[in-house]
Swiss-Prot record:
Record GO biological process: response to host immune response
Chain intervals for the UniProt region annotation (Disordered): 598-618
Protein name: Uncharacterized PPE family protein PPE16
Signal peptide residue numbers: 1-29
Gene: PPE16
Length: 618
């Protein structure tokens, strides 16, 4: 199994086991001695034959002897030089090993981290160790990344040392002996064929269009990538920008999943570091749709919350609006219980501070239901206002477990989302940490697709910008797995190419066919900086559209959008809409998401009024 996917327990143990650099240094000393012996032999042989030819041995026989002996003397000198080169390379190999071993995490440190995790988990009876567990896991991920980085450096350095070793068979061929070609035959004498086309670099096997070394895939810019369209090093996947990502469409380092923007995330669509889940904004979250850090649950807006839809820090429970609450739908601080309105209360439905007991069904006013501490709610356990549903700590939501405002769905910590588990705002889908996305698992903004950490993409797993297609880490491409820019086709690491697998920059204005303007890729686009098919950019800005048949102002993403700009999805008109068939103008830079809405700052479907969630509101 490749060291790229091995845990630090294995990589550290392998690096610290064995004989170390001692045998390599001993080999260097042996080669040094051999070089000295060969050099002395060459000098002695040359001196002896020259002395014979100049003094005692004359005539045609002496001339023939001198002619036959000269190649052997030359071969001895060449062998001595080769031996000295082997000395240098052996010492270089030892130095590479020592540097890698110094960079590798000590196995005892890895064991201590795992022991600490076990201790924290066993004593985590009430969830009090959740932040410490998250920190320990984040430290473990850093140990993993450090070991992989050390091994990648070791592999690269050792490969470079090996590449500089000259085969001894070349020296054997110089001997005046009929058997020399036979001695030089075999694997050592075979030239390694070029097992790819259009690559710039070495060791790119069965691949095209790479710039860099040892890539197994196509269209990468960087080294040791296993996949296509990556910009960076040692990525296992496609369309990544960064180092050692295990997945696709990530921007940054050491992510396990897709569409993450940040480091050490396990999941998809996270914007931050060390998250485990889907669509989180912040660091160290475990769950989905959280905005903040070290939350455990869904749609928490704050930090160190355990539960869902809490708005504040640190709460344990559901739909609490405030700080240090333990329970459900408390509005205030330091409450223990359900639907308390105030501070420091223990009980249910209490209104005021420092109270113990049971109050009204609803502590708020104008509610229809039970356990509402907010106002004008229809449903259960809402601490926000004007909600239809249950467990909402935000305002004007239609659904449940929303800590943001004006959402239609559940588990949204952002605003005006139609869907679930969105930490961003204005999304139509689920698990998006970015804004105005149509799809799921996007940490970037205004994408239509899945797992994009870039922006304005129509497609999936893009870490670049304004691409139509999938797995692009470059910008303004129409196609697949391009790490270069403004390409039409696939696997290009160069710019402005049409076709497949070119690492070269072309001296043209556009790629593709039938484009009018500058910086376009695809087919029959007009204006500047479009990707896709038959888009028309009439906006004042350089950035155009991605997708198919978009027109009007810039930055439309998807199919057949028109209007003044920033529409994402299908058949939208107006400004800043996400979804299908919306026509809101959003003059105040608000966002509308959903289906067939004409009102501003709305979510859901078929809403004509402003600031609406749900369906069919005027």
């Amino acid at each position: 199994m490749s060291f790229l996917v091995l845990p630090p327990e294995v990589n550290s143990a392998l690096m610290f086991a064995g004989a170390g650099s001692g045998p390599t240094l001993a080999a260097a000393a042996a080669w040094d001695g051999l070089a000295a012996e060969l050099g002395q032999a060459a000098n002695s042989f040359s001196s002896a034959t020259a002395a014979l030819a100049d003094t005692a041995w004359q005539g045609p026989a002496a001339t023939a002897m001198a002619a036959a002996a000269a190649p052997y003397a030359s071969w001895l000198s060449t062998a001595a030089t080769r031996a000295l080169s082997a000395v240098a390379q052996a010492k270089a190999a030892a130095a590479v090993y020592e540097a890698a071993r110094a960079a590798t995490v000590d196995p005892l440190l890895v064991a201590a981290n795992r022991h600490q995790l076990v201790s924290l988990v066993l004593s985590n009876l009430f969830g009090q160790n959740a932040p410490a567990i998250a920190a320990t896991e984040a430290a473990y991920e850093q140990l993993w990344a450090a070991d992989v980085a050390a091994m990648v450096s070791y592999h690269s350095g050792a490969s470079a040392v090996a590449a500089q070793l000259a085969p001894w068979a070349q020296a054997v061929r110089a001997l005046p002996n009929p058997t020399a070609p036979a001695l030089a035959s075999g694997p050592a004498a075979l030239a390694i064929p070029a097992l790819g086309i259009g690559n710039t670099g070495i060791g790119n096997i069965f691949s095209i269009g790479n710039i860099g070394d040892y890539n197994l895939g196509n269209g990468n810019t960087g080294n040791a990538n296993l996949g296509s369209g990556n910009t960076g090093q040692a990525n296992l996947g496609s369309g990544n920008t960064g180092f050692f990502n295990f997945g696709s469409g990530n921007t940054a380092n050491t992510n396990f999943g897709s569409g993450n923007l940040g480091n050490l995330n396990l999941g998809s669509g996270n914007d931050g570091n060390g998250n485990f889940g889907l669509g989180n904004i912040g660091d160290g979250n475990r769950g989905s749709g959280n905005v903040g850090s070290f939350n455990f649950g869904t749609a928490n807006a704050g930090s160190f919350n355990v539960g869902s839809a809490n708005h504040g820090s640190p709460n344990v429970g559901f739909a609490n609006l405030g700080n240090n609450n333990l329970g459900i739908a408390n509005l205030g601080n330091n409450n223990l219980g359900i639907a308390n309105l105030g501070n420091n209360n223990i009980g249910i439905g209490l209104t005021g501070d420092n109270m113990i007991g049971i109050g009204a069904l609803n502590s708020g006013i104008g509610n229809l239901g039970f356990g509402n501490s907010g106002n004008n709610n229809i449903g259960l356990f809402n601490s926000g206002n004007n909600n239809i549903g249950f467990f909402n700590s935000g305002d004007s939501n239609f659904g449940f477990f929303n800590s943001g405002d004006t959402n239609t769905g559940f588990g949204n910590a952002g605003f005006t989302n139609t869907g679930f588990g969105n930490a961003g705002s204005g999304n139509f889908g689920f698990g998006n940490a970015g804004n105005n996305n149509f799809g799921f698992g996007n940490s970037g903004f205004e994408n239509m697709g899945v797992g994009n950490s870039g922006a304005y993409n129509t497609g999936s797993f893009n870490s670049g910008t304004l691409n139509t297609g999938d797995l692009n880490s470059g910008d303004f491409n129409t196609g697949w797995a391009n790490s270069g820019d403004i390409n039409t086709g696939g696997f290009h690491s160069g710019d402005l190419n049409t076709g497949f697998g070119s690492p070269v920059d072309q001296p043209v204005m556009n790629s593709g066919f039938g484009n009018i303007g500058t910086g376009n890729s695809g087919f029959n686009n007009s204006g500047d900086a479009n990707s896709g098919f038959q888009n028309t950019n009439t906006g004042a800005f350089f950035i155009g559209h991605s997708g198919l048949l978009n027109s009007g102002g810039g930055q439309h993403v998807g199919i057949s959008n028109s209007g003044t700009g920033f529409n994402t999805g299908l058949f939208n008109t107006g400004f800043n809409n996400t979804g299908i068939g919306n026509s809101a103008t959003n003059a105040a830079f608000t966002t509308t998401s959903g289906v067939a809405n004409s009102g501003d700052n709305s979510s859901g479907g078929f809403n004509a009024g402003n600031d609406q969630s749900g369906f069919f509101d005027g």
